[in-house]
């Protein structure tokens, strides 16, 4: 099931008008004309079978009607609804009654669908609890069980229990989960760690990759590839031995490198770009180029204001979601306009650092298993990637890593993503020292480190600080001997989260940290979410290292 693409349905079959056809971008390699189906989910004993149809695929014009009418304030609500009967029967009924004078779309949806539950709204925190106690008591609230799956819903069944971030996010997310796991380990929840380890391995086995999240509409993309970091955590905490995951790591690597060998310089296919000197680097990608199910109306509106073919904009919006940084000045040609997004034209520093970690992990585990040829091959791949990153993504003049615009052949903006090479051990000590100086002068605040130094209104920019960036910066700088900076970031972040907790009795997705007065972070396509998985995980781990703030 490796590396299968999305099947492109015939527009005539879907009864959708196609007004415009755009030629293939000359930079993008089309390897063949063969249509391949998206991988079908496997059966899980005792649970109804999932399928790969997204709500947009399944409900066609009904889906577009609901999303364009905005009968729910959040575009994610309808894709997360579950049908009360066979979806085909619902679509047939809709087609029969939609033109009736008294047709009420909202009532039709309410009569035919179960609305998604917001579990965390039932939880009321105890103001007397310490931050540590609050987090430990939240794990059961954020846990979902396999039997929670409903037939024909967009939720993909998983074999074991899992943690969700909270709020509108009622499914597990790939890269979020790694940072959540840090806290689970600190809380002694090895039971949940084992469940999540099994779930992610199961997804790789059955989908060929780990999707963005366990929803059908997330199958066409992944997220930052942190499974190698998860495996390292499992090994360190005695949850699972690393050797058992070697094949899974190789499968994930094959997903990210699909098509690489067929590329010529200055050409790209899916996640891979062949650079002018022949080296290989990676970018974020999504196999679909349609509006995202969960942000359908927002994507349509963004494309309208772009002046570009809509399918290009949709692809870049989807690739931005795959990056985990949705959205940020990192992906914008004009930092004031989301419509200028060009995610697929950037070589991201964090993605290539995570893939360096993946290559290194495969080499290290292969060595443990005595597979010398595989070890040598992947050590060479990791070394080649490090060299390519240093050639294209290292700004020697300013002493920082930056993303690289491979279409324009120039360095892009500086952001906190630059700390990931330190976290995975890809930088040398001189680079780490110079980067530390840049972070101190450009990103460090009394509340932690900013996502970027640009104010754009996007959530992964100034004035916001995010838990995963703090963790990777803390550990990354300490790994290279800069305990002073690492400890300063840690204590600043703990102070931010604790001060907000004492006032609001909750942890949230992101924090406004630009001026030393912690408050709710803003920006983005949806209201601020509380819960919150990865904030809980990072803070719980930091409490274990530094004590209660």
Swiss-Prot record:
Where does the record say this protein resides? Cytoplasm
Q: Which domain of life is it from?
A: Bacteria
* UniProt binding sites for substrate: 168, 175-176, 212, 221-223, 292-294, 324, 525
List its EC numbers: 3.2.1.28
Q: How is its activity regulated?
A: Activity decreases with increasing salt concentrations.
- Write out the catalytic residues in the record: 326 (proton donor/acceptor), 509 (proton donor/acceptor)
- Can you provide one Gene Ontology molecular function annotated for this UniProt record? alpha,alpha-trehalase activity
Instruction: Please indicate if the UniProt record lists Hydrolase as a keyword.
Output: yes
- Provide the top EC class: hydrolase
Q: Does the keyword Hydrolase apply?
A: yes
An example Gene Ontology CC term for this record: cytoplasm
According to its UniProt record, in which pathway does this protein act?
Glycan degradation; trehalose degradation; D-glucose from alpha,alpha-trehalose: step 1/1
Biological process (GO), any one: trehalose catabolic process
Record note on pH: Optimum pH is 6.0.
Where does the chain cross the membrane?
none
Q: Which SUPFAM superfamilies match?
A: Six-hairpin glycosidases
Q: How does it assemble?
A: Monomer.
Q: Which family does it belong to?
A: Belongs to the glycosyl hydrolase 37 family.
Primary role: Hydrolyzes trehalose to glucose. Could be involved, in cells returning to low osmolarity conditions, in the utilization of the accumulated cytoplasmic trehalose, which was synthesized in response to high osmolarity.
Q: What is this protein called?
A: Cytoplasmic trehalase
Record organism = Escherichia coli (strain K12)
Question: Which lineage?
Answer: Bacteria, Pseudomonadati, Pseudomonadota, Gammaproteobacteria, Enterobacterales
Q: Which gene encodes it?
A: treF
């Amino acid at each position: 099931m490796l590396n299968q693409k999305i099947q492109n349905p015939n527009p005539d079959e879907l009864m959708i008008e196609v007004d415009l056809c755009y030629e293939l971008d000359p930079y993008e390699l089309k390897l063949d004309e063969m249509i391949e189906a998206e991988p079908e989910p496997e059966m899980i004993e005792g649970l109804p079978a999932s399928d790969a149809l997204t709500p947009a695929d399944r409900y066609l014009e009904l889906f577009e009607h609901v999303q364009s009418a905005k009968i729910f304030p959040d575009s994610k609500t309808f894709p997360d609804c579950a049908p009360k009967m066979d979806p085909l029967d619902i679509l047939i009924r809709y087609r029969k009654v939609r033109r009736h004078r008294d047709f009420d779309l909202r009532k039709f949806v309410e009569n035919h669908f179960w609305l998604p539950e917001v579990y965390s709204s039932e939880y009321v925190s105890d103001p007397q609890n310490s931050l540590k106690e609050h987090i430990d008591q939240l794990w059961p609230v954020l846990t979902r069980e396999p039997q929670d799956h409903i037939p024909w819903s967009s939720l993909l069944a998983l074999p074991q229990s899992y943690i969700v971030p909270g709020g509108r996010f009622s499914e597990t997310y790939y890269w979020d989960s790694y940072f959540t796991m840090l806290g689970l380990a600190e809380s002694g929840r090895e039971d949940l760690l084992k469940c999540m380890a099994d779930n992610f391995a199961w997804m790789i086995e059955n989908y060929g990759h780990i999707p963005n999240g366990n929803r059908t509409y997330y199958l066409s993309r992944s997220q930052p590839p942190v499974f190698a970091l998860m495996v390292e955590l499992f090994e360190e905490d005695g949850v699972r031995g690393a050797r058992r995951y070697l094949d899974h790591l190789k499968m994930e690597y094959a997903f990210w490198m699909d098509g690489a060998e067929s590329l010529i310089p200055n050409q790209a296919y899916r996640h891979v770009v062949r650079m002018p000197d022949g080296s290989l680097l990676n970018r974020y990608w999504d196999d679909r180029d349609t509006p995202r199910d969960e942000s359908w109306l927002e994507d349509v509106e963004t494309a309208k204001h772009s002046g570009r073919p809509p399918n290009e904009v949709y692809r870049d919006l989807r690739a931005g979601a795959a990056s985990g940084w949705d959205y940020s000045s990192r992906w914008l040609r004009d930092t004031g306009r989301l419509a200028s997004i060009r995610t697929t034209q950037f070589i991201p520093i964090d993605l290539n650092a995570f893939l360096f970690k993946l290559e290194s992990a495969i080499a290290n585990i292969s060595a443990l298993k005595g597979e010398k040829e595989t070890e040598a091959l992947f050590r060479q791949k990791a070394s080649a990637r490090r060299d390519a990153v240093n050639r294209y993504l290292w700004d020697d003049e300013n002493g920082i890593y930056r993303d690289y615009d491979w279409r324009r052949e120039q360095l892009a903006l500086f952001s906190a993503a630059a700390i990931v090479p330190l976290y995975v051990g890809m930088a040398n000590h001189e680079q780490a020292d110079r980067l530390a100086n840049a972070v101190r002068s450009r990103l460090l605040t009394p509340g932690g480190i900013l996502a970027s130094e640009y104010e754009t209104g996007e959530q992964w920019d100034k004035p916001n600080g995010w838990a995963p960036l703090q963790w990777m910066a803390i550990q990354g700088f300490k790994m290279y001997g800069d305990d002073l900076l690492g400890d300063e970031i840690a204590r600043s972040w703990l102070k931010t989260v604790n001060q907000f907790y004492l006032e609001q009795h909750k942890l949230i997705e992101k924090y406004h940290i630009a001026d030393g007065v912690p408050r709710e972070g803003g920006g983005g396509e949806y209201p601020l979410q509380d819960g919150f998985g990865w904030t809980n995980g990072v803070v719980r781990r930091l409490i274990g290292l530094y004590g209660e703030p």
